[in-house]
Amino acid sequence: MDILGATLRVYVDDLEKAIPFYEGLAGGRAMRSERGGVEVAAVGCFLLMSGPESQLEVLRKVAATIAVTDVEETLRAITSLGGDVIAGPVPTPAGRNLIARHPDGAIYEYVDRRA
């Protein structure tokens, strides 16, 4: 399993207002999507999220989003090391993801960029 990098999760009240700042900071354009009532904008290493508090409450439990080369390989590594998969793998607009709980209780999202 290769870890390619991590994305910082930023929860904002007003996505439209936040995007220009993060685009300027990261030097790139936001890639937008929506899932389960939560609006998402990926800008550089930032993942901006805005939506109903009931949905964000669940998302706030995820410490970070980690980019990997292959989600299936990551699933095998996590489970063989004593972690468990809470959700996924499932397709997303950017690739596939899964949510996993590490043996210490920390929860992370893992994503790959496969079509």
Question: What residue spans do the PLM features occupy?
Answer:
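Vicinal oxygen chelate
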Residues: 1, 79-115
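N-terminal beta-strand motif that seeds the catalytic metal site of vicinal oxygen chelate
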Residues: 1-19, 62-64, 114-115
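Acidic di-acidic motifs
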Residues: 14, 70, 102
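Conserved active-site tyrosine of GNAT-family acetyltransferases
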Residues: 18-23, 78, 105
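Conserved acetyl-CoA-binding loop of GNAT-fold acetyltransferases
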Residues: 24-31, 82-84
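Conserved short beta-strand elements that form part of the metal-binding/catalytic scaffold
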Residues: 28-61, 107-113
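Mid-chain, well-packed structural core segment of small domains
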Residues: 64-87
